[in-house]
Amino acid sequence: RLRRQRQICIRDRCRLVQIKIAESRSIFFKDMQNSVIPIMVSHGEGRVGVNVNENVIGNYVDSSHNIAEKYPLNPNGSKNGIAGVCNEDGRITIMMPHPERTFMTKQFSWAPNDWDEHSPWFKMFDNAYKFSKN
């Protein structure tokens, strides 16, 4: 059962963290599993409270790609570093971070040289577009 809880830190936070995309049914993350991508978080409340690790779409991770349990790498203190979940058929996905703030490479202060105009988060939006065309 999914529930929203107050985050551990009670201040608004806006910063980059890393997420490792999990294998899931989410249509948004097709062919993205195991990618580790920086992403913006920006919120003052909310952390994911999930009793089981089913349908997890991604986890906050540290620089060694281990699940981050504590602030600041897990900015809201979600259990098991859960950043989001999807429903059983993958058509509904909810997540705390903001991929819309990081889908263009120019939205980052620094990016790897192998990124083109779009960051890896653009694939999430492209997947949604392709799903809607079917």
Label each region the model flagged:
Residues 11-134:
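Amide-donor transfer/coupling interface in amidating biosynthetic enzymes
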Residues 1-10:
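Single conserved hydrophobic/aromatic residue that forms the stacking wall/gate
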